[in-house]
Structures are given as structure tokens and as C-alpha cells.
Curated annotation (Swiss-Prot):
HAMAP family membership: NDH1_NuoB (MF_01356)
A Gene Ontology term for the protein's cellular component: chloroplast thylakoid membrane
Taxonomic source organism: Chara vulgaris
Keyword annotations of the record: 4Fe-4S, Chloroplast, Iron, Iron-sulfur, Membrane, Metal-binding, NAD, NADP, Plastid, Plastoquinone, Quinone, Thylakoid, Translocase, Transport
Name of the protein described by the UniProt record: NAD(P)H-quinone oxidoreductase subunit K, chloroplastic
Residues annotated for [4Fe-4S] cluster binding in this entry: 66-67, 131, 162
Main EC class the enzyme belongs to: translocase
Length: 244
């Protein structure tokens, strides 16, 4: 097999007129014979690099919730995701794909960003599940849930579902492979901007310094004597939660 580097200024139309077959990101097995036109493959370094990347994706499994159980079934023999060249890695320095499956909390956000920064370039992200994409059922009144992992790291493929099926995960990997096949290695493949890609509402809870109101004082006064109550209550009475 001979690989010929084509200059960008070369006229490809003249080559097509000579009945040359262009095999770009082909998955079929190559065969050689006595005919020269089927023994020589004409391609570019860009397509060759993209073919090598999409054929050897090494994912870093970042499972935090029930969505990861669906992804774990892909490792078995029923779905066999090794046929796509995926090799699970436990170190971010050996991975070029991170799959976030499950809820991401505020305390876990710095660790996730650090794992993403330690991955080798070029790197890709698949957001798996409703909790990862929008916060899921925790997106309305949760104070500790990140409402979308794309606010922390750039996302290439979104897999909605609660949880998504293994077939949907395979389809997401195929779509990511198509994105990699169309990339230009001379350009930066990410222009990350913080955007709201979904409708989300922030919680309206305000946390004062005390958690005692008039009802709690009345309940305590019925159970304790006056001396014990005055010695116990050293904080001014205020509402526990007030709505803005």
C-alpha cells in the first residue's frame, strides 16, 4: 500500500478523470491485485490522521450515577464496543475521550475540569443522560447540581435519556467518529463558549443566619421552662427560609 500526499493546490478534478478511486475513511478490507489503480491509495495527511483518530478512541469512564450501568453493559459480549476501537482507560493522560454519565455536583466540578485538562489533545466529550445535559430532575430546586456539564467543559455529542439505551450510546460513538472524520488538523477544533442550550430555572431559596421562627419558638416554649428557653435561645428570631 502506497500513501501519496496530495498538495492542497493540486487539482483533484484531473485525478478523478483518470478513474482513480479515492478511499477516504473506508471500513472495507483492502485487497491488492495486478492492477495498479486498485493497489495505490491516494489520500491526504488530514484524512489519514482523522482515520487513525476515529479508529482508536480511548475513553475515560466518568460514571457518577445510574447512567453508567447502561454504559457498563457495552463492555460485555452482547454489544462488544471493542469493534469500534474503544479501549477503556483509567488514566486521563492515556485517554482522548471522556464520557460523563450521571449527575455532576458543584464539589465534583473542579475535579472534572482537572481531568479534562489532563487529557491529551485532541480530546472529545460525550454527555450521557439527562442529569449530565440539563441537570435532570435536580435542575429546578437543587443547590448542589451543575445544570449542564457543557458549562464546565465543551461537549461534542449529547445523549439524552434517563438513562439512554446501549444502542443510543453506540449511535453517539458513530456520530462522534463522523465528526472526527471531517475535522481539519491544521485548525483548533474547539471554540468553547458558555451558552445556555436549554431552559433552566435557578432556585429561589435564601439562607439566613438563623433557622428559628415564631412557630419553632412556641414549640420550644411548650417543652422547656422559661429559664431553659432564655438560656437556649441566644439568636434573634427570624424566618428560616424566605422567598425572593
Amino acid at each position: 500500500m502506497v500513501l501519496v500526499y496530495l498538495n492542497s493546490n493540486l487539482n483533484l478534478r484531473s485525478l478523478k478523470e483518470t478513474n482513480h478511486d479515492f478511499l477516504i475513511n473506508s471500513t472495507e478490507r483492502l485487497t491488492t491485485n495486478q492492477i495498479l489503480s486498485t493497489s495505490v491509495i491516494l489520500t491526504t495527511m488530514n484524512d489519514l490522521t482523522n482515520w487513525a483518530r476515529l479508529s482508536s478512541l480511548w475513553p475515560l469512564l466518568y460514571g457518577t450515577s445510574c447512567c453508567f450501568i447502561e454504559f457498563a453493559s457495552l463492555i460485555g459480549s452482547r454489544f462488544d464496543f471493542d469493534r469500534y476501537g474503544l479501549v477503556p482507560r483509567s488514566s486521563p493522560r492515556q485517554a482522548d475521550l471522556i464520557i460523563t454519565a450521571g449527575t455532576v455536583t458543584m464539589k465534583m466540578a473542579p475535579s472534572l475540569v482537572r481531568l479534562y485538562e489532563q487529557m491529551a489533545e485532541p480530546k472529545y466529550v460525550i454527555a450521557m443522560g439527562a442529569c449530565t445535559i440539563t441537570g435532570g430532575m435536580f435542575s429546578t430546586d437543587s443547590y448542589s447540581t451543575v445544570r449542564g456539564v457543557d458549562k464546565l467543559i465543551p461537549v461534542n455529542v449529547y445523549l439524552p435519556g434517563c438513562p439512554p439505551k446501549p444502542e443510543a450510546i453506540i449511535d453517539g460513538v458513530i456520530k462522534l467518529r463522523k465528526q472526527i472524520a471531517q475535522e481539519n488538523t491544521n485548525q483548533k477544533h474547539f471554540s468553547f463558549e458558555h451558552k445556555h442550550r436549554y431552559f433552566s430555572t435557578n432556585h429561589k431559596l435564601n439562607y439566613p443566619t438563623t433557622c428559628y421562627n415564631e412557630n419553632s419558638v412556641n414549640l420550644l416554649s411548650q417543652q422547656l421552662s422559661n429559664n431553659d428557653l432564655f438560656s437556649f435561645m441566644k439568636i434573634p428570631v427570624d424566618n428560616c427560609f424566605t422567598e425572593e
